Regions:
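Flexible, membrane-associating and regulatory peripheral segments of lipid-active enzymes
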Residues: 1-53, 76, 109, 156
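Serine-dependent carboxylesterase/thioesterase catalytic core
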Residues: 53-64, 68, 74-183
Length: 186
């Protein structure tokens, strides 16, 4: 799908979320505290059956930001694993090859396709990496990630601009990858 086809399908109305939505992220520490208190009330059925789930944190976050999710998935019988990149610095061109390597390695270890769970930019990376190694991915779960497009349509676009990262270049490569549709469920 090229840019013209993308705009024909989705229009020009896609843009960054409002700043007020980004400010909602400030509630994260309070939400984490509520989760810690309510932890024992969460469902605990063994539904994962040892399936591997690769966790990808959002922009500006490290693997430790996914600790609650990892513990919960493990308690459900999944084998949740952190990505090897550590801190998500937002440089998609550098992170994407590492995510692809992680997917291949964990899929090979599991001898089966794995699931990907990405938060924000981590969800974008999960989605785009899955295009490259579809045979290694059984499902993609995203939390607060754009379903179409890339960082250009997120609240962190301004941070990309400040850091001098070219969101148009990232967007153009995303549109080029649309030529290869994702076949696993998202």
């Amino acid at each position: 799908m090229n840019k013209a086809e993308f705009q024909k399908r989705y229009g020009n109305s896609i843009g960054q979320p409002k700043l007020s939505l980004l400010l909602g992220e400030a509630k994260t520490p309070f939400e984490a505290a509520k989760l810690a208190v309510g932890w024992r009330f969460l469902a605990r059925k063994n539904v994962g059956q040892g399936q591997t789930v690769l966790l990808l944190p959002g922009f500006g976050a490290s693997s430790s930001s996914m600790t609650f999710i990892k513990r919960y998935l493990n308690s459900l019988g999944y084998k949740a694993v952190h990505w090897s990149a550590g801190f998500n610095h937002g440089e998609v061109g550098k992170l994407l090859p590492q995510v692809i390597t992680d997917i291949k390695e964990h899929s090979e270890q599991a001898q089966a396709p794995i699931k990907l769970l990405g938060w924000s930019l981590g969800g974008y990376l999960a989605r785009e990496a899955a295009r490259e190694v579809q045979q290694n991915v059984s499902r993609i779960v995203t939390i607060g990630s754009p379903v179409i497009g890339g960082p250009k349509y997120t609240a962190v676009k301004t941070l990309y601009d400040i850091r001098g990262l070219d969101v148009e270049s990232i967007e153009n490569s995303t549109l080029k990858r649309f030529e290869h549709p994702i076949v696993c469920p998202i």
